[in-house]
C-alpha cells in the first residue's frame, strides 16, 4: 500500500476518534442538526476503521508467519506457509476494500430523490410500461425500507402513465438509483395486439437528488412565475372545488414543474419549489458530468436521458443493461423489484472507473 494512502487512512482514523468524542458532548447532543451530521459521518467512517484494523492485523500475521518459516519443525513450517497464504489473501482483499473506501464520495449519495418516468415512443404501450416501471421502483423502495409519494401523475388512456413524478426518501436513495436515468426499452406483445406481434416501446427515467438547503441552490423570487389551476385526476370531489394545483416556471432556464397531489395549495407550492430546486441542481450535475466526459469517457453514470441504458425483453424473459453488457434471464424478478442484481454491478463498474482514474493521476 502506498504511503499516501496509509497517511490518508490514518487521518480518517483520527477523525473517527474525534467524532466519537464530539458525539458524547452535551452541546452536540442538544443540537439536532450537528448531532445528525456527525452521526452520519461516524457511520461512514466506522467500516473504514474496522477494515484498516483488520488490514493491520493481517500485516502482523504475515510477519509472524515469515518468522515461523525459519523453524526446524517441518509441521510448523507447513503451518507457517498456510498462514502466510491466508494473510496475503486477506491483505489483497482489504487493500482493495480500503481503496474503494477512499474513492471520492458523491456528496448527493445520501439524498432523497425525485423520480420522473415519462412514456416515450410506443403510444399506449409506452404508457402501460411506464406504469410497470413505477411499480418496479415502488417495490424496490419497499424492499429497502424507503418511502415513496406521488407528486403528480398523468394517466394513460389504457392504463399506466403518460408521466408520473414521485419522491422517494430514506437512507442512501440517490446512491442506489442514480444510475437509472436514461431510456428504458421494452419488447413484448401488447395486450391489445391480436396478431401476436412483438412491439418495441420506450420510456425515459430521470432520477434527481432532492436539493438540500446546503447545496446553495438559491432561487430569486423575481425569476419565477407561479400559476394556480384546478387539480385533475384522483382525489374525489375535493379536486374540483379549489385551484390548489401549482405550476412554477423558472424564467431564466425555462424549467417548469407542477404539483397537484397534495391537499392544499401551500403544500403543493412547497413540493413544487423543492422539485424545481432539484431540477436546477440536476442541471448543474449534468453540466459537471459533461465537462468530465469531455476528458474521459465514463461507462456508467452519464445520466443522459436520451441514452438507451436497458432493454426488457418479455418473450425471452431477459433484461439487458447496455452500459456494462449485463444480461440476466430473470425479468419477472426484476419487475417485482429485485433490482440489486442490476444496480450493484453498476455501482461496482462505477467504482472501477473511479479507481482507474485515480491510478492515472
Curated annotation (Swiss-Prot):
Domain of life: Bacteria
Isomerase keyword on record: no
Biased composition (Basic and acidic residues): 287-297
GO CC aspect terms: cytoplasm
Residue numbers of N5-methylglutamine PTMs: 237
Function description: Peptide chain release factor 1 directs the termination of translation in response to the peptide chain termination codons UAG and UAA.
Family: Belongs to the prokaryotic/mitochondrial release factor family.
Protein name: Peptide chain release factor 1
High-level lineage: Bacteria, Pseudomonadati, Pseudomonadota, Gammaproteobacteria, Thiotrichales
Designated gene of the protein: prfA
